[in-house]
Design a protein with these regions (language model features):
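Flexible phosphate-sensing "switch/lid" loops adjacent to ATP/NTP-binding sites
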Residues: 2-376
Length: 376
């Protein structure tokens, strides 16, 4: 018997895509034939032949190795202006039919599980009749709800989300809590477990916060500060795990941090790089693990940096990508801190880690048993 599972979340940025990817991979690892669909998407990528697909559908196609067919894996895109266009002429946008036809391609003869990934919070899409709850109902799927780590606010958000699914007659079969600080895991498991037990909903997993899932690529940082690449563009996909400013280099423990972003004013860069080398030597390191340099307060820092032999030797020897930004160091730090890091096709290590986290912290056997033993 085929099972349709709809992965919803109480909010954006809770980790829905990460958990969905982990569940798909974990089911596959158990020998099941798994199909994936993002019925309603908002952020899309352009493909060949003037086609578009949700960016998450592209991620899953590459990670799970299937041919991306937008009309099947990403049937509806609600981009800018879509909702206004819909209400100007609803008959021209048969969204429901597109979703139903997409799901029909996942026949029981070919797929044991169909995993449908939701969009945003449960109410997203309501303006065109495609809330997460409505889509789950029309596709005949049952819901697993992903919630943020917490107690009071998390329970409030769950209650609001569950009300919408109940209104549509859709059953929520379990809850997975994501991004929980390690020292809060048992407390959250205890209290959320009590509440969910009273509601008759299983707690299927508590996934700890994993810092590596939040590491941005240097290219994402460049975009956030509207920077320009000065040197070594081929290394712009270095991952960034920590940040140090030039003024704090001498107090920074380089031994406990890898993939460091150095943020420094262009004029002070030669002096700061010498300090980096000195600190590394004092701390017993053969070389500092600098993954990128952001030169601040700079509109055309290339001549200034290129004219300094020490800077160029450091950049070339350690193959460090360098960008510049007009922002000052404080302004750049604010922009970087505001980055919302998403799993994508350029971060394959995150896809692998997502699978590990789900396999380790989600009771997948319980999830399977629920779907196999309880009638749809």
């Amino acid at each position: 018997m085929q099972h349709k599972i709809y992965i919803a979340a109480t909010n954006q940025h809770v980790g829905k895509t990460t958990v969905t990817l982990g569940i798909c991979a974990a089911l596959r690892n158990q020998g099941y034939r798994v199909g994936y669909c993002k019925p309603v998407g908002q952020e899309f990528v352009s493909l060949e032949n003037n086609l578009v697909a949700d960016k998450d559908a592209l991620l899953f196609a590459k990670t799970l190795d299937f041919k991306l067919e937008p009309h099947i894996h990403s049937p509806v895109i609600l981009g800018d202006g879509a909702t206004q266009a819909y209400w100007d002429s609803p008959s021209e946008y048969p969204f429901r039919r597109q979703i139903q036809e997409a799901v029909q391609h996942f026949t029981p003869e070919l797929f044991d599980w169909v995993v449908l990934e939701g969009t945003g919070h449960p109410g997203v899409g309501s303006i065109v009749g495609l809330s997460n709850a409505a889509v789950a109902r029309m596709t005949g799927a049952r819901v697993i709800l992903i919630v943020r780590g917490g107690i009071g606010k998390t329970i409030d958000e769950m209650a609001m989300s569950l009300a919408l699914f109940h209104q549509e007659g859709v059953r929520v079969e379990g809850v997975i809590v994501n991004k929980v600080l390690p020292d809060k895991i048992e407390k959250i498991r205890h209290y959320l477990g009590k509440v969910l037990n009273a509601w008759g909903i299983p707690l299927l997993g508590v996934i700890p916060y994993d810092a590596s899932m939040m590491f941005p690529l240097f290219e994402l940082i460049r975009a956030s500060v509207r920077g320009k690449v000065l040197f070594n563009p081929e290394y712009m996909e270095n991952r960034i795990a920590g940040i140090v400013t030039g003024s704090l280099v001498e107090t920074y423990d380089l031994r406990n941090q890898s993939n460091i972003l150095l943020v420094c004013n262009a004029i002070r860069l030669p002096e700061v790089l010498k300090k980096v080398i000195k600190v590394a030597e004092v701390q017993g390191l053969t070389h500092p693990d600098i993954a990128g340099i952001l030169v601040t307060n700079s509109e055309d820092g290339h001549p200034l940096v290129a004219s300094d032999a020490y800077c160029m030797d450091f950049i070339e020897r350690y193959q460090v990508p360098v960008i510049e930004s007009k922002l000052d160091t404080y302004g750049a730090a604010l922009r970087i801190n505001a980055i919302e890091v998403k799993i994508n096709t350029r971060t394959p290590w995150k896809a692998a880690r997502a699978t590990e986290l789900v396999q380790e912290y989600v009771a997948l056997d319980d999830l399977i048993t629920i779907f196999e033993t309880r009638p749809a």
